[in-house]
Each structure stands twice: as structure tokens, then as C-alpha cells.
């Protein structure tokens, strides 16, 4: 543990010296942790792995500001929270948990990868705040969840502009959405930014995710190949090269010209960088792939360390083989000594990374920190230009060859010359060098001013480039909206066609329903007739019951009167008894006063005698009462038997009378009902004619309104088409401007590189002159010690630079991809827009012709449909009214039945009233016979009237049926014609759609071929550049 802590502290010190943020990894896999608060995590961590624990809540991570990778898979987390402060988080793994909703990701601006597989998620509303350009989410894994709504999925994913990889199904584990028909096509249409869906590309070809994961490792392997292939001594740092160069200067006329520096374009560096670091997006899906990647990284690190050790050994060998003789020169002036110190201080640290890799890294650093470079251009310069100049001077310039010649001449000079000659030659050389320095300083000042102006121009061009990028983003959004509007219009056309088909089907159904309604109306009329008959019968029965109830009520009144009289009598008797009791009490008191008191024995004897007498009397009374009770019970039984016989006789008589009366009443009801039915038929026929006339008027008004609305929609569509054409022309102009700006940018970059290389060459000359005058043996020894210390520090810097190189390479790959996609989309859009303009013009002409025909036909159909629909509505209203009446009548029937049952019970209880009814029945019979005669005469008359009315009704029904049949035949003929015409239009439209699809497929095939040819050319160029670099 102490050794690990020491290593971490040493790395932190090295990184703080270099100016980079501290970083570290922590892994607590399968440790049985219950919560994150049990750990004391450092705020400088950038990766935390808590896989396979028992954590149920995300907490205690707020203080880790620099966290970039977080793995909380295989835990018991049910909610996403506590991540608001982790703004630098790039990857988040929450697979194999208990999460049901995606939320709490609003503040994660740098999040690029999200793995939420193997959960219970059915709500993705937490992805809506991540919409827009601010968030950069590229990879989402959602397989093995509970997402069942495709509408909700698309609503949450549409705004994720950088999303390129979406996984909803993997290795048989999917979501309910994946089982819907056409799921893949719908998602790819609505999310055009997707490149990979369910581990398959846009064309349905399977994609190997392990290859994508290992693309980062391929980048490092390419760097190692360049390291191994470079045989030139470029691994030595710049300070060592400067110190070991000979102290003899070359004149300014013999320096490398500007054209030689300008002839080395920066595009070659970029192409070599693109060939080394291919586009890759790291995707970590399985732990096995992660382990393999870590093993490969360790191997690469070991190889890099071996190469560094070899280069250090080669440097030591060079030092041993080529010992330099010490110069016997002294420090001439304090100013020269100060300049030398400043030069030594300002020389930045150099690493042992080869030329190719270091130029890549420094170019990236220059692109990232361009604004800071402008602000402090006088203090520090980008290191890649220095190395370019050093490498070019070592490889191409004849400077070293010329410097070796005077060196040999100095070694071979005879020591016999006097000291005077040497002193004079040194003074002359000093004067020449001072003049050259003065000229160089003036040229340097001029070049510095010129560089400031160039930086200003570069800043302005960068602003223009940013504006161009913004305009391209806006153009993409506009094109996306246009595609969506076009899709919506096509959907609207399909919907209208489907609605027309549905309306035709509904017409046929409405006709069938009308016939069914007519049949149903007839059946309802029959049922109404039956109900009216039953109602009349019930009314007659009610009248009878009411009469019976009235008779029973009168009998009950009589009984009540008798009971009241008996009550009055009993009350009088009770008053008399009270008076008698009061008199007896008074007499008893008087007797008690007059009586003489006996002794106890006499009193008991007298009491016993009287008790015996009273008991005998009481027994005799009980026997007499019992005999009377027996006699009365026999009489009561005899009376009950007689009463039952009388009741049966009267019931039979009453039943016979009741049957006769009911038969007569039914015949009367039938005759009256026939009359009423005939009158209703006449009224209904007149009301139907009035309703039909009103319906025709209303339908005409509705048709006029529909035609106006259609004209307005057509005008709106034409206006939208015109606006879209204007926008397309603007897009073309802007694309041309963007291309011109790109060409200008490339030219300016090449000019800047040439001029900066020139400036750096002049500075190196100045350093060389300073070292020639001030170099001594003691300074060489000190410099050697310093360089050895620097080599150790640079080996540490190498590791940090390698990490930054990886992140920078990823950023550059992404930018290159975006630029390629933009260029391809702009070219495709140009071709598609030209074809679409011609096609839209043709379609507009055809659509206008079709709209005219269809409007006329739709007007006629809509009028007919409105008439039929209004008829159906009225029939439905009548049907509902009849149902309500039926329900009311059923309720009345139930109430009548209940009343009837109660009355029957009372009638059975009060059967004593039947004796009074006999006299009334006889009178009713006489009246009934008279009524029968009158009713028979009325019946004969009603039968004759009924026959006449039925003849009239039959004639009216025949005429109405003929009219309805004629109208139905005309409607059917018109519908058949319209159906044929619409079928022809649909067939023609389908043919056009097939033609357009064929053209689009041909275009896609051509673009694929062009892409393949371009890729082959790029590979050839990359191979050629690698060969050139190896030759260098």
C-alpha cells in the first residue's frame, strides 16, 4: 500500500509540473458494499468501478468534480440521482439494477455513453432535457427493459442530435417495442442521426462492437510502428542537439531559404495523423473486452519503455564516440551571459517521442489553445514548429556538413601560431557576429509584427468558420424540418385517401343500417301496438281494482265506526267500574272501622274457612266457563266451514263475470288501436317529407363550407412550397460560401506554418551564435547533468503526453467525421434538390388537375352522405325515445303489479265484503248487456273505417318504396364510378412512388461506390505518406 501511495504521489507531482489535472482509478468490484458513503473517495479521481455490490442509492459522489467514468452495474439501485455536480462525466454504466425511470441526467453535459440495460425501465422522459447541441450523448444501451410505446421512445430520442448508436435488442434480450411491425424502419426514419441500431448499421449489416472498442488500441499500435521505423536520431531532445552542435556559425546567406520551409505543407502532417489515428469511438460493453484492452495497453506501454531505453542508450553511445574538445574561450560580456541564461530557461522540456507522434500532439495542442497562443505569442511559441525546423535542419540543411569542415580545420590547426594571431581572429569574428546579431534582431522584430497581424487575420477567419458551422447546423435543422413536413404531408395524403375509402364503406354501411332501422321501426311499431293493448287492458283492470278497493274502503269505514262505538261503550263501562270500586272501598273502610279486632288464632280460622269457600266457587266458575268455550268453538268452526263454501261459490261467479268483461274490453281496444295506428301513419308520412326537405337545405350549406376550406388548404400548401424553394436556394448559396471559406482557411494555415518556421530558424541561429561565444568545458559538464535530470522528467512526461494524445486524437477523429458527413450531405442535398424541384413541379400540375376532379366528386358525395347521416341521426333519436318510453312503461307495469298483489292480499283478508257485492253484480250485468249492444254497433263501424284506411296506407307505402329504390340505384351507380376513378388515381400514384424509389436506390448505390473509391484513394495516400516518412 505504501508503495502504491508513493507511485500515486509521484504521478501527481509530475502532472502538476506539466500543468495537467490529477487523475486516478479506483476499483471495488464484488466487495459487498451496502452504500458508497462507506468509502472515502478522493476528489481527484477520474474513474470509479463499483461493479457487483449491494448499493441501493447513489450518494457521496458530489465532491468528485473530475470524475469521467462511473460503473455502478449489478447493484440494487432503483433511482438515478446525486449526479448533478459531475459535469465532466463521460461514461455511465447502470446495467443490472432495479431502475424504472430514466432521470437526473440534466447536468451531465459531457456524457457520451449511457448503459441502462437489464433494468425495469418503461419511462424515458429523463432524456428530454438532454435535447439540443449542449449535450453530446452518442451511445445508449437499453436492451432487456420494459419499453412498450414507440411514440414515447421517439419523443424522447428525437432531440439527441449526436446520438449515433442505440441498442434496444441484443443477444435475444429485447423490449416490447421491438416486437412491433416496422419498428426498425420507423426509428431509422425519425432518427436520421443514427448510424447503428441494435448492433446493425443502416443497411441491416451486423456490426462487431469489439472492433470498435479496439480501434483506440490500433491508434497506439500505429504510433509504435512509427517509433520503430524511425531510424534517424530524432529521439534526442532539442537541448542535446543544440549543445552537441559545433560552435561554428554559418553566414545568413547560407541559411535555408523560406521557400524550402513553405514547401512543407501542414496537410501532409494532418494526412499522416489521419492515417495513424483512424476514427474510433470507445465502447465498453463486456468485462472480457475491457480486460483484453487493458492487457494490450500494458504491452504497448512496455514496448514504449523499451524504445525509450534504447534511445537513451544510443544517446550515451553517441556521447562516448564523439567527444567534443573544450573551447578555450571566455565569457565576453555580461549581456551575452544573460542571454544564454534566458535561452536556457525558456527552452521547453522535450520528450523522446518520435517526430510523427509529437507533431500530431503539438498540432492538436495548437488547435485547442489557439486563443491563448495569440495572447502570449512573444513569451512562448508552439513547440511543434521548433521540432519541424530542427528536423528539417538535421535532414535537409547542409549546415552540419559545413560546420564539420571548420571543426576539422580547427582540430588540425598547428599549435605553433602565436597568441596574437588567435586574439585578432577572435576579435574579428566577434565584430562580425555582433553585426549579424543586430541584423537578425531587426528582422526578428519585423517578423514579430507581421506574425501579430497574421494571428489577427487567423482569429477573424476562425470566427467566420464558427459562423459557417452554425449556419450548417441551422441548415441541417431546416432540412430536417422540411423532411418532417414532407413526411407529414404524405401522411396527410394517405389519411385523406383512407378517409375517402372509409367514407365509401360507411355509406354502404349506412344504407344497410337504414334498411335495418326501417325493419327495426316496423318491429317497434308492432311492439308499440301490443304495448298499447296491454296498457288498455291494465287500465281496465286498474279501474276494476279501484272499484273493489273503494268498496273495501267503505266496508273498512263501517268497521271503524262500529269499533269506535264499541270503544265508547267500553269506556263508559270502565268509568262505571271505577265508581263501583270507589264505593266498595268506602264501604270496606267503614266495615274495618266498625269491626272488632280478633286474636290471631280466631282470625286464622275465619280466613281458612272463607278461603275454602272461595276456592269452591272459583272451581265451579272455571268449569262453567270451560263448557261455554267448547260450545262457542264448535259454533265458530261450523261458521268457518259455511263461510268457506260461500266464498268458493262467489269466487266462481265473479271469475265468470270477469272473463266476459275482459273479452269485450280486448275487442274494443283492438278496434281503437287500429284507428289510432292509421292516423299516426298519415302524420308520420307528412313529417318525413318535411324532414327530408330540411335535410337537403342543410347539406347544401355544409357542402359550400367544405369546398371553401379545401380551397384555403390548397392555397396554404402552395405558399409553403414557395417558401421551401426560397430556403433551398439560400442553402445552395451558403454551401458555396462555406467551400470558398475552407479553401481560404487552408491557404492561410500553410502561409502561417511557413512564416513561423522561418522565425524559428532565425531564433535557432541566434542560440547557436550565443553558444559559440559562451561555451566552455565547465558549462558542458553542467549541461550534461541537467540533461540527464531532464531525461528522467521527460520519461514521466511521456506517459502524460500519451494520455493527452489519445484524448486529442479522439477529438480530431470526431471533427473529421463531422466535416466528412457535412460535405457528403451537402453534395447529396444539392443533387436531391435539383431532382426534387423538377419532380415537385410535375406533381403540382398533376395535383391541381386531380384536386379539381376530386373536389367536384367529393362535393356530390358529401351532400349525399350528409343527407343519409341526418336521416340516420333522426332514426336513432326516435329509437332512443321509443326505448325510453318502453322503460317507463315497464316501470309502470311493475308498480301496477305490486299494487295488484297488495290489493289481492287485502281482498283475501276482507272476504266478508263479497256478500254486499252480489247485489251490485246483478246491476252491473244489466248495464253490461246494454253496453255490449252499443259496442257491437261501434265495432262494425270501426271495421269499415279500418279497411278504408288500410287501402290508403298500402297505396302510400308502394309510392314511397318506389321513390326510395330509384334514389338508392342512382347513389350506387355514382359510387361505383367514383371508386373506379379513385382506383386509377391510386395506381398512377403508386407507379410514381416506385419510380422515385428506384431512382433513390440508384443514387445510394452510386454514392456507396464513390465512397469506396475515396476510401481506397485515402488508403493509398496514407500508405505513400508512411513510406515517405520512413524514407525521411
UniProtKB/Swiss-Prot annotation:
Hey, which family's this protein in? Answer: Belongs to the LRRCC1 family.
SUPFAM superfamilies noted in UniProt: L domain-like (SSF52058)
Map out region (Disordered) in residue numbers.
316-345
Protein name as annotated: Leucine-rich repeat and coiled-coil domain-containing protein 1
Which is an annotated Pfam family here? LRR_4
Originating organism:
Homo sapiens (Human)
* InterPro entries for the chain: Leu-rich_rpt, Leu-rich_rpt_4, LRR_dom_sf
Instruction: Enumerate the subcellular locations listed in this protein's record, separating them with semicolons.
Output: Cytoplasm, Cytoskeleton, Microtubule organizing center, Centrosome, Centriole
Record key words, sorted: Cell cycle, Cell division, Coiled coil, Cytoplasm, Cytoskeleton, Leucine-rich repeat, Mitosis, Repeat
UniProt feature, compositional bias: Basic and acidic residues: 318-330
Q: Can you say where the LRR repeats lie in this chain?
A: 44-65, 66-87, 88-109, 110-131, 136-157
Q: Which gene encodes it?
A: LRRCC1
